[in-house]
């Protein structure tokens, strides 16, 4: 991959789509053709691959019996020829609504046009005939039209509901069209098309507006995109349609796998477009992982096996078009306050319920936990406290130790004691430094002779002793050791293996990424899970630098200065674990999410001082670190990880669950992909 096209969305598995609405002139196909071409030219300049227009946009949806007038139908065909001719030098595939004569009926059609030719024509399957709708008076039912052709512009073109349109030069871009009512039936044509391979489902809609119908449309579009693991592009008729008995709002929107990517203002006065970049890689990956999707295709192969595919070349631009979709800086932490609060409520209670069930299943032992005053052990402790509350047990059944070492600060130790005291757990302090000195002396470590050697052995002696003490204390007191290590540390292998923080009897934090941890604790404070004193202590802990506190010195020993920003590592982890994306694509996404601290939304209450930006060289640097540690180093630690609940839809790293990988693999394929492009400049 060269620096020239690294910035192109089409090099990273995206395709730009647009749902277009504008002013319709009823019964004036030539005027409407010019509106379509005006939109098409704008979409061409915007790098759009697929532009979708409303139902019967060339004449207006609301013209009733005028649909049976030859003069009008003649003009529709002539206007369509104008659109075809005008598209010759333009990029987008145009999906245009028009009434067309075929055999003995008039059909309500989606005409697929690209670069001066008609690729195919799809008739509406289910013209409605209830309430305000009376389409069957004029329009034929196209549901059984399969394998046919239609004469259009002097040529024979494919005609039927069994048509897919595939871009040969954009992997994964496979288009299917359905019309308005088609998506309201129990088994819509788009469902079969998705099983047959369509990834971009489009709906040309008339759909007069009534109170509440907008939300119904959104529900159906969201559901279709989620069930079909597809993009769903919807364009409804708007201004200019007849208001004899109805009104129109011109709603346009783009969904992808259940997520709203773009929508227009309703009741627009002029041209309006909902434009978004749909992620074809994401859709492909989700379908591959969800094996039942293809199982369902096989069940329905009698219907899905005979779809016809019309191939075309899009010839997408290699230029930098930006990225037209919202990206979360923190994929595990939504910026929307309501969604974040809901996620935190669910995550916390998943952890609490997981621990409560485990304790009940093994006879109700006490819980032994080491409390450092840092985020992870703090959160594990408040999970344990709530689990005891739910089980009707005293919090004194939690046996909490703070185990200070050579570099433990007074600040973190004081916070640990305050938290244990305010929660009412059984608290104690056990200083590990005498035992650590003895062990280092017996090992003939230079530190024992007074030399300031703070190597990995020095660090792991402390980490190992803490865990060793906790396990022996659990033996002595009839308890289990509660693990505190989080999902991000598991990904990077940032733990001491065996007799160290990698091991416990049960780990409530193993499914929680580091970037979510602080928000969980903030939610615990704001939702009043504990008293005010506990809340104040939790707030003080949130302000503490992330550090293992293993090396003596004047400055706080920051984990992130060594291993990299957890913000970037969690961004990478989400896209590797959930979607299997290439490192080069993750770099592209991370740059768009992180290069400008002032752009986009931050999670609520995120500290201003920590709202930083990252340039591409820094993103690549830490991506390489992640790839080396995740793929080539850390799996042996994950292969032996304790039980713990999955928390996020982003995935878990349990070898019994979401991530099953060999412990002796390597990172070469991922590092080669990351090296495919020279260092581009934005």
Task: List the predicted regions and their residue ranges.
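ATP/NTP-dependent adenylation/nucleotidyl-transfer catalytic domains that generate, transfer
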Residues: 16, 32, 171, 228-230, ...
């Amino acid at each position: 991959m060269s620096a020239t096209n690294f910035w192109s969305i089409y090099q990273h598995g995206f395709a730009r789509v647009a749902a277009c609405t504008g002013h319709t002139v009823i019964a004036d196909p030539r005027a409407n053709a010019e509106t379509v071409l005006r939109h098409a030219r704008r979409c061409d300049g915007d790098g759009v691959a697929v532009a979708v227009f409303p139902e019967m946009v060339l004449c207006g949806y609301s013209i009733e019996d005028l649909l049976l007038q030859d003069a009008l139908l003649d003009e529709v065909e002539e206007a369509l020829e104008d659109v075809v001719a005008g598209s010759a030098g333009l990029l987008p595939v145009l999906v245009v609504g028009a009434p067309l004569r075929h055999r003995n009926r008039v059909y309500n059609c989606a005409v697929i046009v690209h670069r001066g030719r008609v690729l195919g024509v799809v008739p509406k399957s289910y013209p409605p005939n209830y309430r305000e709708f009376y389409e069957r008076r004029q329009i034929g039912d196209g549901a059984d039209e399969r394998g046919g052709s239609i004469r259009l512009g002097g040529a024979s073109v494919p005609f039927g509901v069994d048509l897919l349109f595939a871009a040969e030069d954009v992997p994964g871009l496979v288009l299917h069209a359905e019309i308005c009512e088609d998506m309201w039936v129990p088994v819509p044509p788009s469902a079969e098309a998705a099983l047959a391979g369509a990834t971009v489902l489009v709906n040309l809609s008339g759909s007069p507006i009534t109170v509440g119908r907008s939300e119904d449309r959104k529900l159906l579009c969201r559901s279709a995109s989620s069930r079909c693991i597809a993009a769903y592009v919807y364009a409804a008729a708007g201004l200019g349609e007849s208001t004899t008995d109805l009104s129109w709002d011109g709603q346009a929107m783009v969904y992808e796998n259940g997520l709203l990517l773009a929508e227009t203002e309703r009741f627009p006065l002029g041209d309006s477009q909902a434009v978004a970049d749909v992620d074809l890689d994401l859709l492909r990956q989700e379908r591959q992982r969800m094996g039942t999707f293809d199982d369902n295709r096989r069940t329905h192969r009698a219907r899905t096996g005979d779809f016809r595919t019309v191939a075309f070349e899009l010839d997408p631009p290699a230029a930098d078009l930006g990225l037209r979709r919202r990206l979360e800086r923190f994929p595990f932490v939504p910026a929307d306050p309501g969604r974040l609060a809901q996620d935190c409520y669910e995550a916390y209670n998943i952890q609490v319920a997981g621990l409560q069930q485990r304790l009940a299943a093994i006879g109700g032992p006490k819980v032994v936990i080491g409390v450092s005053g840092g985020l992870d052990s703090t959160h594990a402790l408040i999970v344990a406290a709530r689990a005891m509350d739910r089980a009707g047990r005293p919090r004194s059944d939690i046996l909490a130790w703070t185990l200070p070492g050579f570099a433990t600060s007074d600040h973190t130790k004081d916070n640990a004691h305050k938290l244990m005291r305010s929660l009412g757990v059984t608290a104690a302090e056990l200083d590990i430094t005498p035992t650590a000195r003895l062990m280092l002396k017996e090992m003939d470590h230079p530190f024992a002779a007074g030399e300031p050697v703070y190597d990995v052995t020095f660090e792991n002696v402390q980490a190992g002793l803490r865990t060793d003490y906790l396990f022996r204390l659990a033996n002595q007191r009839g308890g289990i050791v509660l693990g505190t290590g989080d999902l991000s540390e598991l990904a990077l292998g940032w733990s001491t293996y065996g007799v160290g923080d990698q091991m416990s009897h049960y780990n409530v934090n193993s499914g929680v990424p580091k970037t979510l941890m602080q928000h969980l604790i903030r939610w615990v404070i704001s939702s009043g899970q504990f008293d005010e004193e506990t809340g104040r202590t939790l707030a003080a802990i949130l302000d503490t630098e992330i550090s293992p506190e293993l090396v003596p010195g004047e400055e706080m020993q920051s984990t992130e200065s060594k291993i990299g920003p957890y913000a970037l590592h969690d961004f990478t982890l989400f896209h590797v674990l959930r979607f299997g994306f290439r490192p080069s694509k993750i770099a592209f996404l991370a740059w768009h999410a992180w290069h400008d601290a002032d752009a986009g939304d931050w999670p609520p209450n995120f500290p201003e001082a920590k709202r930083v930006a990252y340039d591409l060289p820094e993103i690549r640097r830490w991506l390489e670190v992640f790839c080396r540690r995740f793929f080539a180093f850390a799996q042996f630690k994950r292969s032996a990880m304790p039980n713990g609940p999955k928390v996020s839809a982003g995935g878990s790293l349990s070898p019994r669950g979401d991530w099953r990988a060999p412990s002796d693999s390597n990172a070469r394929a991922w590092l080669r992909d990351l090296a495919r492009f020279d260092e581009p400049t934005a």
